[in-house]
């Protein structure tokens, strides 16, 4: 809660600064040879399928929330709406409000909203989701980006700029499209993957932040390698000033690379879901540090890639549970169904081999 309160205060200060004609600050003494550092973690698709609705969501990240709490700022791709009852899973997701609150309680500070399911319940569903997130922002400091209720909110949230630890960090979140509805409608705003829209966000981010995190929702589902469209966009985003690019949507981990020195994680995969298709239960948590040293030079340290595994009910315990793979290697005796441990290790080896991730 203290982390979120601080982030919220700093976000509000940054909003005031962006809207002010000048930003006067009294300089404070600072020791020589020090660096400003902001640690960030991003996780992939947080989903709520129909079967998940039957279980207590407050256990989903019980075994991995320590990873979410470690960072100064943690962001997650929230791939569902909060459209109210009746709650539904695929193909049109509507989760309980408590699910979003649980993710906040686990340590998630920023909700990434631009994805293909955000209009699953129409304009009304998106509007209600934004109302819930706005209330959470007011009450507990949760922030969001990728969508907005109106032009004023759009200016504040897209890009989302956070000032913390002496660092200004911008999140630029956008999606290739939506499964239903029309994301091009003027309000509520869904940030689309077109060059004009994204270029405007990137320009504002460059001008007002030290580091720019580009978060595209893109790519082909279930493919372990990125496609030509993703690569073209990644190259363009580096030209537009991205400091790091972290993608979502394919529901599996994809390969990583560097383009002109900029780290690119093409897809993180599913953080939690009921999906059991090949490779869909393995995910990456992406951890990095944004650093400005005493000379004013800026750099991204990392990313460090942490593999997570989503166990479904009856495998490790009687609920869904996302676990850090490395912490559970060699502990097959913990599983109710040992074959799931074998599935985890085999999937890990296969994905590492096919993506080239060490």
Regions found by a protein language model. Name each.
Residues 21-358:
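Acidic, metal/ion-coordinating pockets
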Residues 1-21:
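Bacterial Sec-dependent N-terminal signal peptides
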């Amino acid at each position: 809660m203290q982390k979120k309160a601080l982030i919220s205060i700093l976000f509000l200060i940054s909003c005031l600064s962006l809207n002010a004609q000048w930003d006067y600050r009294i300089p404070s003494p600072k020791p020589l040879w020090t660096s400003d550092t902001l640690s960030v973690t991003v996780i992939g698709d947080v989903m709520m399928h129909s079967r998940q609705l039957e279980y207590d969501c407050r256990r989903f990240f019980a075994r991995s929330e320590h990873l979410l709490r470690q960072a100064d700022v943690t962001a997650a791709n929230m791939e569902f709406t909060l459209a109210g009852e009746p709650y539904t899973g695929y193909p049109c997701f509507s989760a309980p409000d408590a699910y979003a609150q649980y993710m906040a309680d686990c340590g998630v500070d920023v909700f990434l909203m631009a994805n293909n399911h955000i209009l699953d319940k129409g304009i009304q569903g998106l509007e209600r989701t934004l109302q819930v997130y706005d209330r959470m922002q007011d009450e507990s400091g949760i922030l969001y980006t990728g969508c907005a209720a109106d032009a004023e909110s759009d200016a504040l949230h897209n890009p989302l700029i956070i000032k913390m630890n002496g660092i200004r960090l911008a999140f630029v979140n956008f999606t290739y499209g939506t499964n239903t509805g029309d994301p091009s409608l003027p309000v509520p705003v869904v940030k689309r993957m077109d060059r004009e829209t994204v270029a405007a966000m990137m320009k504002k981010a460059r001008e007002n932040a030290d580091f720019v995190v580009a978060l595209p929702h893109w790519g082909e589902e279930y493919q372990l390698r990125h496609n030509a469209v993703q690569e073209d966009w990644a190259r363009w985003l580096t030209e537009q000033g991205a400091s790091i690019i972290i993608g979502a949507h394919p529901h599996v981990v994809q390969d990583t690379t560097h383009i002109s020195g900029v780290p690119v994680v093409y897809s993180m995969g599913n953080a939690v879901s009921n999906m059991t298709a090949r490779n869909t239960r393995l995910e990456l948590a992406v951890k990095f540090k944004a650093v400005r040293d005493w000379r004013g030079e800026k750099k991204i340290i990392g990313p460090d890639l942490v593999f997570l595994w989503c166990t479904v009910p009856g495998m490790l315990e009687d609920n869904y549970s996302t676990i850090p793979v490395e912490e559970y290697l060699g502990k097959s005796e913990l599983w109710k169904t040992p074959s799931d441990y074998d599935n985890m290790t085999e999937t890990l080896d296969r994905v590492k081999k096919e993506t080239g991730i060490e």
